[in-house]
UniProtKB/Swiss-Prot annotation:
It comes from Opitutus terrae (strain DSM 11246 / JCM 15787 / PB90-1). Keywords: Ribonucleoprotein, Ribosomal protein. InterPro entries: Ribosomal_bL36 (IPR000473), Ribosomal_bL36_sp (IPR035977), Ribosomal_L36_bact (IPR047621). GO terms for cellular component: ribonucleoprotein complex; ribosome. GO terms for molecular function: structural constituent of ribosome. HAMAP family: Ribosomal_bL36. This is Large ribosomal subunit protein bL36. Belongs to the bacterial ribosomal protein bL36 family. GO terms for biological process: translation.
Length: 41
């Protein structure tokens, strides 16, 4: 999982990326390609 400063660029890396908020952190998850996981914060 990458730690990124820009969620927008992480979301645009793959069409299946979703932005989710958990425990005060913002995550980008992708069930099709799990290597595109990222978090911010």
């Amino acid at each position: 999982m990458k730690v990124v400063s820009s969620i927008k660029s992480a979301k645009k890396r793959h069409p299946a990326c979703q932005v989710v908020r958990r425990r005060g952190k913002i995550y980008v998850i992708n069930k099709v390609e799990p290597r595109y996981k990222a978090r911010q914060g």
